[in-house]
Amino acid sequence: AINPSVNANVGDIQRLPFLGLAAASVLADDAVNIARTDWDNFETSWDFRDLPLLREGTKGATLAESWRNWEAQSLAAIRRMQELETENNRLFIDAYGLAGELSSEVPEEQITLARPSARADVAAFLSYAVGCMMGRYSLEMPGLILANAGDTVAQYLQKVGSSLEQLRFAPDDDGIIPVLDGDWFAD
């Protein structure tokens, strides 16, 4: 027994068999970077910067083309993560002599990166578009621009460092976006 009590001390942990594998560390770093990038593609991430459909390398002439480019990038990231996890498993199986006991293969369905979904990605596009209309996001600079209910277009312009005329897309000044053909507000 490593320690007959319920407690685990530093010495107990140091006695656990572990082979330091530099290659596994590199694989882990790559996997973490892919997972972090995947998470940061969502507005719920604190590090969300912009919509993947609108990025250089993904953005196409149409939304459909942008989505196909995004789908290809997403599927490539999933395949790369699967390769990394399989290689990582192989390293540890070989290091601990478990070749006959375990398989290194990782099925694609076990990769937890977001799968491309036209429905979900168009919903994210619409959410981002509304965010741009309200000044939460900007096409001029990545990241969160305005986050508080009382923020103004003047604060938006100050944060993006442009005048209203220089913007590719300006936020609505009163935060009211008409979606019906009838008049409901004076503006």
Language model features with spans:
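Non-catalytic DNA-recognition/assembly elements of restriction-modification systems
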Residues: F18-D187
